[in-house]
Amino acid sequence: MSTFPGEDTRIPKRISEALSHQPLNHLVPKRELSRLLSKPVQISVQLESEDAFEEVPEELWQYPHPIDLDPLRLEESQPLRFRRPRGARLDYREDSSEIADLPGMGQLARACLSGTQLVDSAAIVESIESNAKKRKQTLAIGDVEMVSPDKKTKVMASVSPVSLNRVALGSQHLKTLERLMQYIGADESSAEFGDFEYWITLEDRATHILSEQCIDKLHIVFRNILSIPAVWTELDVSLLQRIMDVCVSTITICLEKIELKEYSHDYTLIAFGSSMVVFFIFLLDQNDRRLQLEQYMMVPLQFLTFTADNLEEEFDRGGNGVERSLAMLHSTLDVFYMYISNKPKLDDGLVVKLVYMFTELIMSTWSHNVSSVSLQNHIGNVKTIGMKSIEVLFEKLPEQRLFIIDELLSHLDNLPNTRSQKRMKNIGKNLHITHFSYIMLSILQVWNNYDYCSNLVSPDTEQLHDLIAHHAATQSDLEFAADHIIDTILKKCFSNISKYRFVFDQFVTDMTTVVTLPDWPVSDLILARLLKKLLSIFNPQSQKHINIESVALQGIGLIGSTILDIRLSSNSNPTANLIHLFNYPEDIDGLFKAYRTCLAYCTNSVQHHTPYKFLWCKQLDVLTKLKEMDKESQGWGSKLQQKFLSLIESIHLPLEQAANLGAVEILPTYCSTLLTSELINMYEPYLKLVLSLLERHKVKLRSGAIRCLALLISKDKNMLYTPIVKETIENRLTDSSPLVKDAILELIELGSSYIDFYQHININYNDDSMLVRKHVLRMNQIIYDDTEDIIIKAYVASRILRRIEDEEDVIIETARSELLKRWILSIQCPNAKPELQIKNCRVSIRVIAQLLVGGDKICDLFEHFLIFYVLNKNAHTEDQNKLISSSLCLLTDQVIEMVIENEAADVDNQREEEGRNIMKFLSVLSSCQDSFITKDHITALYPYLHSDTKSDFQLHILKVYRNTFEQLSHFKPKFLYDLETTILSRLPRMNVRELDEAIPLSWSLSRHRKDDTRICKACASCLGQLSPYIANATTDPSAVRPDGKLQRLLYLATGFARFCSFENTEGKFPNLKTRENIFEYVTKCLLMFTKENIHHVIRRIATKNLVKIASRYPKLFNSRHVLTVLDTQFEKGILDIQLVVLESLYDFFLAEERRSLIQVGVDGTISSNNELRKVVANHTKSDSINDGICSALVSRYLDKILKICLIADLNNAMVAIRFLKQILTYGYTNPSLCVPTVIALTASPNSYMRDLSSEMFSELLQGYESMAFNCLNQGIRLGTEYAVKIRPKQFHEDSMFLRRLQQLMSTNKRNRSKFLKVVKKTVFSNYLSTSVNYEESCYHIIYLLHNLSKISYDNMLELYEMLRSVISVSEYFSDRISERLDGFQSNQNTAAEVSAIIVTRLSIEEFKRFMFEQHHLSEAKLTLLDATDDENLRNKSVAALDDQVGSLHMENIFLGYENPINNKDYCWKYISTLHRDEI
């Protein structure tokens, strides 16, 4: 016997092999298993005895016949007991014949049978035939035999010859309802509570609720009845009332169970189903009062509100319960939405509850944390139906609109603080906004006149007038609501910016997102109102906190950028606004055509109803505004009346079928309609505000304004060329804030406008901020590469070149390497053809030549760059050095070719100037230690030495020859002879600069020829011709006249003495009686021409040449005779001679410095020229004999030099100032001796002189800060005297002297306080004290008070202390005047003294008036404050005055007199203004 079925067969193996290749879904119900994992286990059978689960007795296993129907111990075992089925009742009828025939049945069995219907005999079948779809199995194993199932029989639907009409069908539905009522019952007594299919009896056996099956059947019946309105009148109201009573009772009981957390039945599902039944009955539109009981509506709503309130708790518990609740809630609210949409009127209390419930659903925050896509969809569905319901309530109940808006606004805290898509409402492809903005836009669009207009047919004039009035009222309500929303949001945000800023940001972002979509036509009105509010924040009369202004500016920038998007996206003229339509009425039809296209688009929109109506009404708004522009014109009114009539007629006509346009295609058309909106018209005020904010002192505002401009420029690069924008950008590049400058530069980069702004960009090439300098450097490189203009290239290259003196090594290295790459390395770029190499080479030559025109400073920098970097072999690799060498050789060849081409051709002035510049470049190349000029080059240039053209061309050729002959050798003798002949023959016709090159060149030629005979003859001839003049100077100095020959002889003699090391022998100089050195002899000759009686022109030339010889032989500065000449000139000499001496000394010091730099830096790797000088100062000063002489000369004449710096003639003073800057840079003097003069020079009326002195003072501050503060008092006094002396009538026009010093010295808070103390001490101790002579200093006091009014203060305490001091001084002067009035009236006191005191007193009073006015103070306020208020005042900041704000009014001081000092009329006029008590 087999122990199991299939034993000894292959059936088990076949089954396992077959199943190994088949899905097991039909065997293992995975869906049900997954549900079981999370579903709590419930025991459906409650056992009172555990016998059924006792262990099997051992003897049972030993029973010889295991399969037996007679179990062991049958008599002793207890029977199994089963739990009563749900809904089963025990109130069976004993008289039932069917049950009576079944004796021995238990009570439960009888009850079950009594509630069971008899089965129809036709339903009894022998076997069950399944209609389930069979899977077609594939044969995997060859030896498995499978029987294919029979094909499924195709069942054809029979066509009934009888068709029921809808009324008959409705009657069938009513009968179905009546059959259901047999079980529900007309009342409690007739209800079939025992039928568990329709009723559920709770544990107390006295409470009954509808079953799920019953509710489902009610849903089906009522849905069918609702589809056939014709049978609604046949419904029995009492039947409906019974159903509603049962449903309300069911909902109430279920809600109680849910609150008690009882889960024996699905109470939630039953309550939702019952609520839907109630709402279905409401939809039947039965006006019977019996169905209008409050409980019928309030109980379901109470349940829905409870469910909505508990969604978050349910979500926190986890599981899929919340998803199920949301699905049921959505279905129920969907039915309720149908009800309120059709209901003409709702109770106010009901509306309030509905608004509360829907608002909580829409603005719930727990949904922000949902990650499940399915759950997000359910939440979105519920929020959508909630927003639709709110919109319906808003439309149907105008009196509740503000309440609805306020309720939504009360939930602003619930807005998402990020733009996460799962937290927002999807309104289109990749477009999302917050649910708050969605519902606000939706309800605001309800405010329209479409329905009003649709009721008009061919309106007359009166009706049109009423229409316009109605439209105005609607617009007024809409604008009021929009303002209320905006004010609430702004108030919320500004109350705590850090906490609620996201509310404002989200709202603005939402509005700018939808403003270009025709589905949301109200958004432009909201943005216009919002922008107007934000612009008002920057009203100067009501200044707000900087954080508020910053937030507002960010919003303004986003809105302004959106306006520009609209202007650029429009397919119409950007200026086609209302003014344009007023001037060109024929364009109105084109605008309305665009509107019709947008309306056609809206008809295809999902939410087309309200947007369509509002968009249509915007046409009406356009016509209304056009009418307001000229109310009185009858012709204009007549034209518009026709437009009004046409518009009203169009509402009754079908729209033209437009192409199926998408959001992208409709954008240009809709933007063209927006051009007439108020929002677009605010673009100009917006732009003006942004530009004005660039001039504010608050850096945060300026930075924000720049970001706004950046948004605009990124969209429209032509924005930078708008005159107002361009002018503002240019002005702001001089801004004091590095961040602002850098941001402005980024704006220019954004607009790709480098070349157009290249000059303004380079205003900041030497800015204090490394960030700005690096930015300018980077932009200059781009400009250089992008432009083809040689002048622009040279300009930016010069600025790059200046950065080799930067204090940052990174900038230095960048500047040097970039110039090397562009000027040198680019010549022979890899794989470049010879033609391209020549082209690159010539570009570099032209740029460098143009650059060298920039002055001595730029020439020195280029020479430094060339010698100390380009030709510094230690700074480059071996390959780079080879490339540099070959490139410079090619460069030199091309320079020579270009020089020859220019000279050979008939060129214009511009090309001629370019040729001179190129020749200057060649002279710089020739000065390099590694000369790239060959003998062939020298020979090629020789013919041009004979040119008689008076220009610098010959000078540069002489420089090239001089430098080259010092390095090259082995020239042909004939060439050397001819060249020497040419040079010597042209010496008498050369100017001073040419002589300085030609004479050393002649001496070099004589050494190459090893024959100095000819140059000695030339020198002897010169000295011989000079002898008669020396004789006259000895015997009769006054007889020496300044003729041209004598001047030229002096220069020639000096040149020979400086550059030629002659051997004074009788053979070479037979006419000289002395055999001393030629330079000594010439020095004595020059001393003869420096006598006092010699004409000052000759004296000036002789003194200049004397200093030049001494510069060549510095030991002459130790000569008593030379020093006597210099002492005399500085003590009592003429100014022009003093300036000549300074210029000569300047050249001497410069030459000494250059010599030191070359000694140290040729093979060095020092970063900058400044650093190189420091190395020179540290290592070679002690070794240089001449350095001591330089310092001694400066110390000897420093006082005279400083006085010359402060003379009234600014042009002459500039010579001394340049010399002062040089000696400070080279360290030839004690800086403390110069600081007061440097401070005084910052009061100069000349802007260049002010800038130069400010630069000098800044350098002194960096190295000697304490010393600078110690000298500040003296510097202010010296500067005051200088300012009054240099402009005695207009000294008061400069009120920024102290302000400039404050900006330079206030590098930190301590220094700012220190500066104020020094200034206060200077003013009150040195000028406003009892020991001052006011006749001499009253103008100084006016000047100081003018400047004192413009300095800034850190806090109110500093300002108050200053004003208190001024008030006390004012009282003192008032007493002084009173003391002297009697004496003046009796002629005992002079008018000079009295008038000076009056001027001082009035200037102090005017200062008080100005300060009180600018800082909104008064003397009364000052008197109320005491020492206890100091701490509060110290914590209050003081707004700095604008540079453009005026200062003291001189009319109030001078009383109309040009010179009040020593003027009796002035004194009497002042006395006449005094009160009797003051006299």
From Swiss-Prot:
Keyword tags: Cell cycle, Nucleus, Repeat
Localization per record: Nucleus
GO cellular component: 2-micrometer circle DNA; chromatin; cytosol; Scc2-Scc4 cohesin loading complex
HEAT repeats: 681-718, 720-757, 792-829, 1117-1154, 1229-1266
Transmembrane segments: none
InterPro entries noted in UniProt: ARM-type_fold, Cohesin_HEAT, Nipped-B_C, Scc2/Nipped-B
A single MF term (Gene Ontology): kinetochore binding
UniProt superkingdom: Eukaryota
GO biological process entries: chromatin looping; establishment of mitotic sister chromatid cohesion; establishment of protein localization to chromatin; mitotic chromosome condensation; rDNA chromatin condensation; regulation of gene expression; replication-born double-strand break repair via sister chromatid exchange; transcription-dependent tethering of RNA polymerase II gene DNA at nuclear periphery
Family affiliation: Belongs to the SCC2/Nipped-B family.
Biological function: Plays a structural role in chromatin. Probably involved in sister chromatid cohesion, possibly by interacting with the cohesin complex.
Annotated protein name in UniProt: Sister chromatid cohesion protein 2
Organism: Eremothecium gossypii (strain ATCC 10895 / CBS 109.51 / FGSC 9923 / NRRL Y-1056) (Yeast)
